[in-house]
Swiss-Prot record:
Keyword Ribosomal protein assigned: yes
Annotated organism of origin: Ligilactobacillus salivarius (strain UCC118)
Cellular component GO terms held in the UniProt record: cytoplasm; small ribosomal subunit
Protein name (record): Small ribosomal subunit protein bS16
Keyword Ribosomal protein: yes
Single annotated GO MF: structural constituent of ribosome
Length: 91
């Protein structure tokens, strides 16, 4: 089972709001997911992001692959830097 961290679209028509979820890569975009680890609202200025960093780090350490958009969101919030530092400091 390949696990991805990706966006799940919520909200109404023309007013998107996203949940950052951990899901099996074979499940549909808005379908079944394993866990919610944050939210992303691109309509606010500046865009609003909330993350459960411990859960995100746990999933990344267990091999979950973030989508390109989620990788950018995590990078802007410093999570990817912490992940890489933790990963390479062990060696």
């Amino acid at each position: 089972m390949s696990v991805k961290i990706r966006l799940k679209r919520m909200g109404s028509k023309k007013r998107p709001f996203y949940r950052i979820v951990v899901a099996d890569s074979r499940s549909p975009r808005d379908g079944r997911f394993i866990e919610t680890v944050g939210t992303y609202n691109p309509l606010t200025d500046p865009e609003t992001v909330t993350l459960k960093e411990e859960k995100v780090m746990n999933w990344l350490n267990n091999g979950a692959q973030p989508s390109d958009t989620v990788r950018n969101i995590l990078s802007r919030n410093g999570v990817m830097k912490k992940f890489h530092e933790a990963k390479f400091s062990k060696k």
